[in-house]
């Protein structure tokens, strides 16, 4: 067990956690967002982060500080906390982003870790190699080997009680990501950033991002705190949490504000296109878009950055509540349908229902069917997998969406998308699900999969499925030996 991270409530891979940061003397509740602070260009004073926005942790770049003589001297003299005016925990990056952007940097793992320690960082980062997406396998494997060597070197650097990140690389090669996760987890390092996914997010390739993160998670242990490097847009926090990520960082709040862009949970709006602010944060409650457009550039940038922080931390709180109440997948589905790319990410997530199911609580408060994706959720997968454990009494069994019939030895209920279940389970989760009266094709097809599973597990039992006018695509999936009766048409 890693002593610095404790997992609490879970919903699939998502969890509420407590990250102990000993050097800062604080415990951070996750999931959480780290505002990125560029010490050369501060848009919102970090001294405001804790009380006004709820930030417990920020991230800044030690390479930028080390490369500027004035900043370097200030940081060494004052320490990061005093220099930035921030009382929470501080994570520092090593310059790997600059390495990805410019191809080289003037530092190494040992030197930058010692510098991070000397300026008072609470969580440091070695210099890893951020292999770009779609790099060929040879490049990805070679650069991963270099990263792993640097992680092993980082273990040997004496940094006191400063925590150290162990970045997980591997480009878009799932097996390399999984291998990288296992190697990183096997070190004595503390946190596990999934790196080099910013290009995927910038290109709206949320499906590929999902595959990369889930592969890394397969290599990491349950007690590994995971940081999704560069995840700063609130539209994808719910998805990222559902992937099992605990820490996100946002430079977007400031970068977007500089370009008059306004973040929402469903995308990005340009200030010029807004007649009303669709938000009740202090900035939006006290100003109109017209008033903000008329301000001086610096004031406009600051207010937009403040809004962007408010909406981002508001979404983090919403994600936490959804995890606590067991409704995160409903939130993910709602966010996914706001943009085709997040929908791709959601569908990629559902392709791994077995991985989600392994850590999903067996019982929650409610299951809401909100669309075709709900038919592929872990709860449906789990129900189908467990059908062969249930005893069927009798040789002639009715599976029905309606009332039981005493002409059969036994009657089972049928509820799309789950399919058949004994009436004794009717009041248990997830069979208490709220489903629409007009079920979609995917829900019926999933129910048919459940019928197949039950029939396969009981080859000597005769089954009759009394359905409420299911579509042909679902009926075609039912085994031929199962008799069909359309209860709506009476045939």
From Swiss-Prot:
Q: Where does substrate bind?
A: 128, 196
Reaction(s) the record says it catalyses: guanosine(15) in tRNA + 7-cyano-7-deazaguanine = 7-cyano-7-carbaguanosine(15) in tRNA + guanine
Superkingdom is: Archaea
Q: Which residues form the active site?
A: 93 (nucleophile)
How is the cofactor bound, in the record's words?
Binds 1 zinc ion per subunit.
Q: Which cofactor does this sequence's record say it needs?
A: Zn(2+)
Q: What class of enzyme is it?
A: transferase
Name the PANTHER family for this protein: QUEUINE TRNA-RIBOSYLTRANSFERASE (PTHR46499:SF1)
Q: What is this protein called?
A: tRNA-guanine(15) transglycosylase
Q: What gene is behind this protein?
A: tgtA
